[in-house]
Every structure is written in structure tokens, then in C-alpha cells.
From Swiss-Prot:
Record organism: Mus musculus (Mouse)
Keyword Transmembrane helix in record: yes
Protein modification: The disulfide bond between PIGK/GPI8 and PIGT is important for normal enzyme activity.
Keywords: Calcium, Disulfide bond, Endoplasmic reticulum, GPI-anchor biosynthesis, Membrane, Metal-binding, Signal, Transferase, Transmembrane, Transmembrane helix
GO molecular function, one term: GPI-anchor transamidase activity
Location, primary (coarse class): endoplasmic reticulum
GO BP annotations, alphabetical order: attachment of GPI anchor to protein; GPI anchor biosynthetic process; proteolysis
Residues at which Ca(2+) binds: 79, 82, 118, 120
The protein's name: GPI-anchor transamidase
Any one cellular-component term (Gene Ontology): GPI-anchor transamidase complex
Activity regulation summary: In the absence of proproteins substrates, exists in an inactive state with a disrupted catalytic site by an autoinhibitory loop. The binding of proprotein substrates, particularly the CSP region, to GPI-T triggers concerted conformational changes that alleviate the inhibition by the autoinhibitory loop. Meanwhile, proprotein residues near the omega- site induce the formation of a catalytic cleft for catalysis, following which the products are released and GPI-T reverts to the inactive state.
Entry function: Catalytic subunit of the glycosylphosphatidylinositol-anchor (GPI-anchor) transamidase (GPI-T) complex that catalyzes the formation of the linkage between a proprotein and a GPI-anchor and participates in GPI anchored protein biosynthesis. Recognizes diverse proproteins at a C-terminal signal peptide (CSP) region that lacks consensus sequence and replaces it with a GPI-anchor via a transamidation reaction. Transamidation catalysis reaction follows a two-phase mechanism.
Length: 395
């Protein structure tokens, strides 16, 4: 009896050890997956969007910046991760025929100002000093959280700038300028302080390519709307407000981004081709020698979208359709069939259709000068016929 009992005990012990080893290997595999996720080089995205121009005739630069702002928000980057700097408030300008709006298309249907724009730096707060402080994190202790770039070594950062520039500089509000050397040194400080993982720099200005010539920090990809010696041209003049609505390069970038959704597999090589010389008139440029990855392997959403976090779990969750909940809720909000329809990524407006449709014909109204002239003619005829003594019958 002793031998069979010993054999049974040995078999049970071996089985227990086998189960324990399987469990430990499975747990180890899950731990490896979790460790790989949390040690990945990219866990969050940030955006710094800067318009450096003042005055009404620079309406298009504000529209450029707000268009990019709208796109990154639509793709999932929250306002808490966006630093928006606008040097002028075109929405409240006295010359704006439609107050509290900024339009990027002739048909006046795509209002990029929207109802939930959070401007972090406005008017005279938009300076070279404040911009460099935001990038390097050297802000006063009293600076609110919304005005800080709270990035780290796992952050991918999109920096978009638009305004008036020249060979090696970009003007801020026609009163000061930032040079390509100052910008390159600021990016180097960011790298040394571990404030970014990868950085995408986009600039829409005249001779924009000169602004990234001095970059020397790793993991930077740069795009510009024009080469050295070229002007970056405007697009879509609107007689109603008397200025152009956008710049050509940003217009076609916006048109490209509106076709992107958070699950898109479109890569950076596609972004390089959005505005050829035949459309932009200027020659867009890009620089990738400092970037470690091949642009064809870099998704657009790595910079323009949110990072969707994944939580690893071993528990099984059973999802069952609760007909009672659906029936009770359908009485208030609609039928169950409507709720069971396929869900799509939310879009504020059918932008792709708005961009390509023709402007609406404007209603004709007699000009003010015509009306004044008509009244003057009537008064002259009255004086000619009746004289000044009958003036009291008019007023």
C-alpha cells in the first residue's frame, strides 16, 4: 500500500509544479507586456500652436492656427495638452462682419473659432520670451497649469508656427523676432531636460525652410511651406471682409487632416505630398535627417492625435444586451434600433464637402453711395420745383 500511495503523491506533486510553472510563465508574459508598454518611448501627445501676427490684414494667420487647433482637438488631443498662442483676436475685431467667428473657407460655413476655443496666450502675451519659456519650461511659479507645456521624455510634441518671416527669422507682432539659432537652442534645451520623445515642427511663413536649417537636436522632423528665397502665398480672398482667409500650405494641410481619423494608418510621407508646387506656388520642404525613424513608419496620429492607453487584464468580461435598459431608454431618447446602429467618429461638420463646394451667391443690396445719391437727386428736384419755402413739408 505504501508504494501506490507514494506514487500517487509524487504524481500530484509533479502536476502541481507543472501548473505552478505554467501560471508563473503566463504571469511573467503579462508582466513583460505591461513593462514593455509602460517603458515605451511614446505615451502622450502635446501641441504648441503659435500665430505671431497682429492686425486685420493678417486674418489668415489666425485662421491658419485655429484650423490646426480644430484638427488636433478632433483627433483627440485635449485642451489640457494644447498651448494656443494668438497674437490678435480676429473674432472680436471691429472690422469682422460676423462677430465671434473666424472662417477658413469662402462659403462661410466652417467656423474654426467654434464655441470651445481656449486661448492660453493672447495679444501682447505672445512674445518671443514667453514662447521660449513655454518650450523650455522656465516659467514663473505663478504661471497657471494651462499656460505650461508639461511634457516629459515620453511626449511627442507638435509645434506649429505661422506669421511673417524672412531668411533665418520669424517676426512676432512686427516688434521683435526669433532667429533660427534661438529656436534650435531652445529645442536642444528641451532635449537635454528630457521634455520630448519626438518633435514635429511645422512652419508656414516666407522662407520657412531657413528656420530649421540650424536644428541639431535628435528626434526632430521639420516641415516648411517655402524654401529660402521664396514667399509663402495666401489663398481664398474674400471680398466681404477684404482679406485672404488662409495661406495655401495650411489650407491643403487642413484638407488632408480632415480625411484622417484616430484609427488612420496614414503616415508622414503622405503629409509631405499634400501641397506640391503646382498648388502652393512656393516649394514646400522637409527635413528628416535628425529623426531616427523612417517617415513611412510614422503615423500622422503619432503627433496630431491622442495616445490611446491599453490596460492589460486577465479577467473575462461577459457583455450581455440588457433589453430592459434599452426599452426604458428608448422611450426617452429614441428606438432601440437607432441605438444599435454603427457608430462613427464624431465630426462637427461635413468638412470635406464644405471645402469643395462653391460659395453661395450673395444677396444683392444697393450700395450706400447709391442710396445717398438717390436722396440727393430727390432733394435737388424738390428745390428746383418748389423752392426752399416748402422744406417744412419734408421734415
Amino acid at each position: 500500500m505504501a508504494a501506490p500511495c507514494f506514487l500517487t503523491l509524487r504524481v500530484a506533486t509533479l502536476a502541481a509544479l507543472a501548473l505552478l510553472s505554467l501560471g508563473s510563465s503566463a504571469a511573467g508574459h503579462i508582466e513583460d507586456q505591461a513593462e514593455q508598454f509602460f517603458r515605451s518611448g511614446h505615451t502622450n501627445n502635446w501641441a504648441v500652436l503659435v500665430c505671431t501676427s497682429r492686425f486685420w490684414f493678417n486674418y489668415r494667420h489666425v485662421a491658419n492656427t485655429l484650423s490646426v487647433y480644430r484638427s488636433v482637438k478632433r483627433l483627440g488631443i485635449p485642451d489640457s495638452h494644447i498651448v494656443l498662442m494668438l497674437a490678435d483676436d480676429m473674432a472680436c475685431n471691429a472690422r469682422n462682419p460676423k462677430p465671434a467667428t473666424v472662417f477658413s473657407h469662402k462659403n462661410m460655413e466652417l467656423n474654426v473659432y467654434g464655441d470651445d476655443v481656449e486661448v492660453d496666450y493672447r495679444s501682447y502675451e505672445v512674445t518671443v520670451e514667453n514662447f521660449l519659456r513655454v518650450l523650455t519650461g522656465r516659467v514663473p511659479p505663478s504661471t497657471p497649469r494651462s499656460k505650461r507645456l508639461l511634457s516629459d521624455d515620453r511626449s511627442n510634441i507638435l509645434i506649429y508656427m505661422t506669421g511673417h518671416g524672412g531668411n533665418g527669422f520669424l517676426k512676432f507682432q512686427d516688434s521683435e523676432e526669433i532667429t533660427n539659432i534661438e529656436l534650435a537652442d531652445a529645442f536642444e534645451q528641451m532635449w537635454q531636460k528630457r521634455r520630448y520623445n519626438e518633435l514635429l515642427f511645422i512652419i508656414d511663413t516666407c522662407q520657412g525652410a531657413s528656420m530649421y536649417e540650424r536644428f541639431y537636436s535628435p528626434n526632430i522632423m521639420a516641415l516648411a511651406s517655402s524654401q529660402v528665397g521664396e514667399d509663402s502665398l495666401s489663398h481664398q480672398p474674400d471680398p466681404a471682409i477684404g482679406v485672404h482667409l488662409m495661406d495655401r500650405y495650411t489650407f491643403y494641410v487642413l484638407e488632408f487632416l480632415e480625411e484622417i481619423n484616430p484609427a488612420s494608418q496614414t503616415n508622414m510621407n503622405d503629409l509631405f505630398q499634400v501641397c506640391p508646387k503646382s498648388l502652393c506656388v512656393s516649394t514646400p520642404g522637409h527635413r528628416t535627417d535628425l529623426f531616427q525613424r523612417d517617415p513611412k513608419n510614422v503615423l500622422i496620429t503619432d503627433f496630431f492625435g491622442s495616445v490611446r492607453k491599453v490596460e492589460i487584464t486577465t479577467e473575462k468580461i461577459s457583455l450581455q444586451w440588457d433589453s430592459q435598459v434599452v426599452d426604458s431608454s428608448s422611450k426617452e431618447d429614441g428606438t432601440a434600433e437607432e441605438r444599435m446602429g454603427p457608430l462613427k467618429y464624431a465630426e462637427q461638420l461635413p468638412v470635406a464637402q464644405i471645402i469643395h463646394q462653391k460659395p453661395k451667391p450673395r444677396d444683392w443690396h444697393p450700395p450706400g453711395g447709391f442710396i445717398l445719391g438717390l436722396w440727393a437727386l430727390i432733394i435737388m428736384v424738390f428745390f428746383k420745383t418748389y423752392g426752399i419755402k416748402h422744406m417744412k413739408f419734408i421734415f
